[in-house]
Every structure is written in structure tokens, then in C-alpha cells.
């Protein structure tokens, strides 16, 4: 990881998609600042598509895609993509499991009952009622408990990951990166090779590691330094500030590089 301030001029000039984690990347200590919201608006005003890629529940994602300056939201660590209609207030929902979504949701409900009965200390997150494709457990303070919980979920055939709020579990061969590539290819006709120049991703925790490994332009929030030993893949760049402040640094750098390229192009005319 290198300080973002050291990025060479023009490096991000081809970025047309900003994908970003939400909790403690757009927010800081659970709050979204006006400046961060404004940064999302600045990206859209510059013609850059914005897609949060988050572990957050469907209920949160529905509100985000309807009211925030974003083009869509990938939620519950890749379980679905909610896409805002180009005109009006409509939202189209695309689930990884598609026709099997109801069955998968029931399977997760049964598993949650088993796990909380097996481990009395295991508690579901307050937002679990608003989830459609994942389980979210409050992070145990005891690392032994966390390991036991993950092992039981894996033995049941579920995938798991951790962010700064929850232990997330789901059924299916996907994660943030796999679903992001599917969305970019299916809805924006952007293949993996083209995405290396066109996509910028920002995040702050373990569940962002696949994105850090899968894309060239990646930014970690400054708080990531404290957990770098537990993250399988690190971002190319690190911000100076935490949460939304770090995200704004990335937005400023992208827009600066794009303005410089436009100025050079106009000067050559």
C-alpha cells in the first residue's frame, strides 16, 4: 500500500466506474457526512457511474438506490444487485439465486435458529430482519468464539467473511468481486480486462479483499492499517483520512486526473 498522494498524474484518468464499500468507507463511526454525499454527486455529475458494494442488508440498499446519487447497489456481500431506473422511481432487483431466492432465504432462516441454539452467545445483527440473502452475526469479542462460529457455518455449507460490523454468512459461490464482475459485464458491457482501467474501488476491511485483489485501482481507508495482518489482499493505495474523508480523497484524485486529461485534449485541438 502506498499513500494515495503519491499516485502519478493521469493514473486514474480512465476511471468511469467507482465501486465502493459503505460502512466505514463512505461513513465514519456510522455517520455519512454531507461532504461524502456531495462527493458521490460530484462523481455522477462528471458522468462516472457509482455503485456501492456492501455487506449491508436489502432494506438499507433499497433506500440507498432510491435516494442516493448512485446507479445501483450490490448488497449483502454480492447476494443481489438493485438497479435504479433511468427515469422515475423504479428499482429492478437482480438476485444471485434468482428463481431459488425464497428457498435460499428459508435455508438461512433455519440455519440461524440452529446456530443460535448451539451457541447461546451468538446473536444476530439488529438488521437481520431486513436481509434477503445472508445472515449477519454480531462479532463475538472472543476470537475463539468467532472461529467456532465460522467453522460451524462452513460445515453447514455456507461462506463467511468479516467486516467492521458483522460476521456475514451466505449460500452460493459468490463474493463482492464475483458479483461485481457479473454486474459490470451483464448490465454495463464491461469485461474484466477493460475494468482494470475503468474501475476504482475503495474499502476498509476483510470482505473487501477480493476487490483489492481483483482490480488495479484500489484504495484502502486509513483505518485498514490497523488490521492489515488479517486481510488476505491489500489495496494498491491507502488514504490519509478515515472513512468518508478517505473516500473523498479518492474522488478528488479521480476528478483531478480526468480534468487534466480533458485539458490536454482541448489544448491539442
Regions found by a protein language model. Name each.
Residues 111-214:
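Conserved acidic, metal-coordinating active-site core of Asp-based
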Residues 27, 51-53, 202:
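Structural motif
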Residues 4-48:
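N-terminal glycine-/serine-/threonine-rich phosphate-binding loop
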Residues 68-69, 77, 156, 214-215, ...:
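Short, structured coil segments at secondary-structure junctions
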Residues 8, 13, 33, 180-269:
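Mg2+-dependent phosphoryl-transfer enzymes with acidic/Ser/Thr/Gly-rich catalytic loops
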Residues 31-127:
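Active-site phosphate-binding/coordination module
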Residues 18, 43, 73, 218-220, ...:
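Short, well-ordered beta-strand core segments
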Amino acid at each position: 500500500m502506498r499513500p494515495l498522494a503519491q499516485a502519478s498524474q493521469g493514473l486514474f484518468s480512465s476511471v468511469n466506474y467507482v465501486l465502493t464499500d459503505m460502512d466505514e468507507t463512505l461513513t465514519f463511526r456510522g455517520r455519512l457526512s454531507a461532504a461524502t454525499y456531495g462527493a458521490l454527486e460530484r462523481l455522477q455529475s462528471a458522468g462516472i457511474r457509482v455503485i456501492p458494494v456492501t455487506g449491508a442488508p436489502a432494506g438499507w440498499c433499497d433506500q440507498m438506490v432510491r435516494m442516493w446519487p448512485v446507479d445501483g447497489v450490490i448488497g449483502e456481500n454480492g447476494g443481489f444487485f438493485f438497479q435504479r431506473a433511468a427515469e422515475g422511481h423504479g428499482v429492478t432487483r437482480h438476485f444471485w439465486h434468482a428463481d431459488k431466492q425464497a428457498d435460499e432465504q428459508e435455508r438461512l432462516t433455519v440455519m440461524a435458529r440452529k446456530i443460535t441454539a448451539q451457541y447461546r452467545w451468538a446473536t444476530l445483527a439488529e438488521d437481520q430482519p431486513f436481509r434477503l440473502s445472508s445472515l449477519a452475526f454480531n462479532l463475538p469479542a472472543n476470537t475463539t468464539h468467532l472461529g467456532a462460529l465460522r467453522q460451524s457455518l462452513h460445515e453447514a455449507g455456507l461462506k463467511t467473511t468479516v467486516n467492521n460490523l458483522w460476521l456475514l454468512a451466505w449460500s452460493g459461490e459468490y463474493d463482492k468481486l464475483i458479483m461485481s464482475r457479473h454486474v459490470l459485464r451483464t448490465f454495463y458491457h464491461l469485461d474484466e480486462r477493460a475494468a482494470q482501467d475503468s474501475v476504482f474501488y475503495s474499502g476498509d476491511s476483510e470482505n473487501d479483499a477480493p476487490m483489492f485483489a481483483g482490480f488495479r485501482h484500489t484504495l484502502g481507508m486509513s483505518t485498514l492499517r490497523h488490521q492489515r495482518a488479517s486481510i488476505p489482499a491489500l489495496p494498491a493505495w491507502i488514504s490519509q483520512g478515515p472513512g468518508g474523508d478517505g473516500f473523498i480523497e479518492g474522488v478528488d484524485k479521480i476528478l483531478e486526473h480526468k480534468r487534466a486529461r480533458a485539458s490536454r485534449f482541448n489544448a491539442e485541438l
